[in-house]
From Swiss-Prot:
Recorded metabolic or biological pathway in which this protein acts: Amino-acid biosynthesis; L-tryptophan biosynthesis; L-tryptophan from chorismate: step 5/5
Catalytic residue list: 49 (proton acceptor), 60 (proton acceptor)
Protein name: Tryptophan synthase alpha chain
Gene3D superfamilies, alphabetized: Aldolase class I
Description of how the protein assembles with itself and partners: Tetramer of two alpha and two beta chains.
Entry-linked InterPro entries: Aldolase_TIM, RibuloseP-bd_barrel, Trp_synthase_alpha_AS, Trp_synthase_suA
Reaction(s) the record says it catalyses: (1S,2R)-1-C-(indol-3-yl)glycerol 3-phosphate + L-serine = D-glyceraldehyde 3-phosphate + L-tryptophan + H2O
Domain of life: Bacteria
Lineage of origin: Bacteria, Pseudomonadati, Pseudomonadota, Gammaproteobacteria, Pasteurellales
Species assigned in the record: Haemophilus influenzae (strain 86-028NP)
UniProt gene name: trpA
Length: 268
């Protein structure tokens, strides 16, 4: 069983949902980022979704774009991100780790080389945000060749064919987007048809569903679980804590610890 499958089975047995924070690797620096990620795991994160710093992220709202810029300004490359992942994996052998990336970033390194490096540093799954199902083949092949689980996004306006494709091709988990638009902690609305989408994904035997976009409050975690999702992903709200404490690292870690504990408590 993969780390994601093992974790979901463990959570199911305890009747808990998953809380998964997202942060950008090397934000604001390599060392601070390592301590941030350790804080997330030590305070109850069930899995990690991590981004590589990139100058042109399509789905990211201003908060995560700023995180990308901080890491890039600090001079961090994709190889630094891989080294950081390696450090995280050696400290936490069990935690499921997924990457959320743009295709250009993978392309720059070459598909095969990128997924091989992911395997070497202990990444479990990769979600390429801007690859439609129709263009998935090369990415899925490269991922599977190196034992990496490909993850796909189910958008709120998905038709039956898309739902079926996402369910069939996703491994590890399924990313259900709460609403159209870019990521944001401010816009906490979600599409009215999410419960139907969850039902349809499950009818097609999709892997466990994690709902993301606009998850900033414990009540929204509860809501995602009530809709039938296996858990919730929180990116902008997590990164915002880093952004507002750039000049006080200890305060940043303390606030992140409290945030993760509160969000995790909502899954029980």
């Amino acid at each position: 069983m993969s780390r994601f499958e093992t974790q979901f089975a463990t959570l199911n047995a305890k009747n808990e949902g998953a809380f998964v924070p997202f942060v950008t690797l090397c934000d604001p620096t390599f060392d601070c980022s390592f301590e941030i990620i350790c804080t997330l795991v030590d305070n109850g994160a069930d899995a990690l979704e991590l981004g590589f710093p990139f100058s042109d992220p399509l789905l990211d709202g201003p908060v995560i774009q700023a995180a990308n810029n901080r890491a890039l300004t600090a001079g961090h490359s994709s190889e630094d991100s891989f080294k950081l992942l390696e450090k995280v994996r050696s400290k936490y052998p069990e935690i499921p780790i997924s990457l959320l990336l743009c295709a250009n970033l993978i392309f720059a390194k070459g598909l095969d080389a990128f997924y091989q490096r992911c395997a070497e540093v202990g990444v479990d799954a990769v979600l390429v945000a801007d690859i439609p199902l129709l263009a998935k083949e090369d990415y899925v092949q490269a991922a599977k060749k190196h034992g990496i689980q490909p993850v796909f996004i189910c958008p709120p306006n998905a038709d039956e064919k898309t739902i079926q494709g996402v369910a069939k091709n996703s491994e590890g988990y399924t990313y259900l987007v709460s609403r159209a638009g870019v990521t944001s902690a401010e816009n906490q609305a979600h599409a009215a048809n999410l419960d139907t989408l969850v039902e349809q994904l499950k009818a097609h035997y999709a892997p466990p569903i994690l709902q993301g976009f606009g998850i900033a409050q414990p009540a929204q975690v509860k809501e995602a679980l009530a809709l039938g999702a296996a858990g919730a992903i929180s990116g902008s709200a997590t990164v915002k804590i880093i952004e507002r404490n750039l000049d006080n690292h200890e305060q940043c870690l303390a606030e992140l610890a409290e945030f993760v504990q509160t969000m995790k408590a909502a899954t029980k």
